[in-house]
C-alpha cells in the first residue's frame, strides 16, 4: 500500500498539468461525497487552470461555504473572482482576509490592486496606505499606493510613492511604469517619455503596446507638426520609439 489518498492523486494531476483528469477524479468523489470541501477546492483549482472560471467560482464558493474559516479557500475564491474580472468582489474577499489578520500585508496589497481594477482608486489608496504603514519598506505596497494616487490625480503623492517603489524594486517594469506615470502627472514629460521609451524596448506583447500608447499620447502633445505626423502612424511611431530616435523637450 502506498498510503496515498485520492486527494493526493488529484493534487499530483494538477501539479503535473493533467487538469482534465483532476476534474474527472473530483467529479467521482463528489458524486458520493458532495460535501467534501477539500475536493471542491481541488476541483476549483483544476477548473481555473482550464479557464472554466464560472465553474471554478462555484466550487470555490462551495469550499468556503463548507468551511468558512479556511483561509486557503477564501484566497482561492478571491483569485478566481479576480481572473473573472470581478474585481470589486475579489477586493471584498481580500479585505475580509486582511481584517482577520491586520498584520498580513499581502492581502491588503491584493485588495488595493483589486480596487484599482474595480475603478475604486480612492478605496485602493486607503488599502495601500494601510499596507505601507505596516511595512514602509514593502515595494509592492509602495507600488500599489503610487498607482492608486496616480489614478486619483495626486501627482506629488504618486511621485513620492513611485520613487520609493522603484528604489525598493530595482528594475521592476511595473515600478518603472508607475514612476513614469507619476512623472507625467507631475509635468515631467521628458522624464516620463524617456522611461516609456525604455520600457517599450524591453517589454513585449500587451505590455509593450500599453507603454507605447502612453508614449505616443505624450509625444503627440509635445511634438511639432512633423512629430505629430509620425505619431499619427502607429507602426512608424512604435518602430522609431524602440530605436531611440524620438525625444521631447524639457
Where are the model-predicted features located?
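Helix-start (N-cap) detector for alpha-helical repeat units in TPR-like alpha-solenoids
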Residues: 3, 37-38, 71-72, 104-106, ...
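TPR/TPR-like (Sel1-like) alpha-helical repeat modules
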Residues: 167-173, 181-209, 216-217
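Short coil turns that delineate tetratricopeptide repeat
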Residues: 34, 68, 102, 136, ...
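A conserved position within tetratricopeptide repeats
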Residues: 30, 64, 98-99, 132, ...
Amino acid at each position: 500500500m502506498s498510503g496515498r489518498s485520492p486527494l493526493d492523486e488529484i493534487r499530483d494531476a494538477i501539479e503535473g498539468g493533467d487538469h482534465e483528469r483532476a476534474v474527472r477524479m473530483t467529479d467521482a468523489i463528489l458524486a458520493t461525497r458532495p460535501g467534501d470541501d477539500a475536493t471542491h477546492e481541488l476541483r476549483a483549482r483544476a477548473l481555473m487552470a482550464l479557464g472554466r472560471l464560472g465553474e471554478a467560482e462555484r466550487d470555490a464558493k462551495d469550499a468556503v461555504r463548507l468551511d468558512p474559516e479556511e483561509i486557503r479557500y477564501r484566497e482561492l475564491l478571491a483569485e478566481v473572482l479576480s481572473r473573472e474580472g470581478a474585481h470589486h468582489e475579489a477586493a471584498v474577499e481580500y479585505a475580509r482576509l486582511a481584517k482577520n489578520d491586520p498584520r498580513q500585508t499581502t492581502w491588503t496589497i491584493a485588495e488595493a490592486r483589486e480596487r484599482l481594477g474595480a475603478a475604486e482608486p480612492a478605496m485602493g489608496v486607503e488599502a495601500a496606505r494601510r499596507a505601507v504603514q505596516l511595512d514602509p519598506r514593502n515595494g509592492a505596497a509602495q507600488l500599489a499606493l503610487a498607482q492608486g494616487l496616480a489614478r486619483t490625480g495626486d501627482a506629488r503623492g504618486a511621485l513620492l510613492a513611485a520613487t520609493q517603489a522603484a528604489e525598493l524594486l530595482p528594475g521592476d517594469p511595473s515600478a518603472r511604469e508607475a514612476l513614469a506615470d507619476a512623472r507625467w502627472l507631475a509635468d515631467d514629460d521628458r522624464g516620463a517619455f524617456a522611461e516609456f521609451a525604455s520600457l517599450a524596448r524591453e517589454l513585449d506583447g500587451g505590455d509593450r503596446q500599453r507603454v507605447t500608447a502612453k508614449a505616443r499620447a505624450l509625444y503627440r502633445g509635445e511634438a511639432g507638426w512633423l512629430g505629430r505626423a509620425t505619431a499619427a502612424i502607429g507602426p512608424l511611431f512604435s518602430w522609431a520609439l524602440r530605436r531611440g530616435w524620438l525625444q521631447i523637450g524639457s
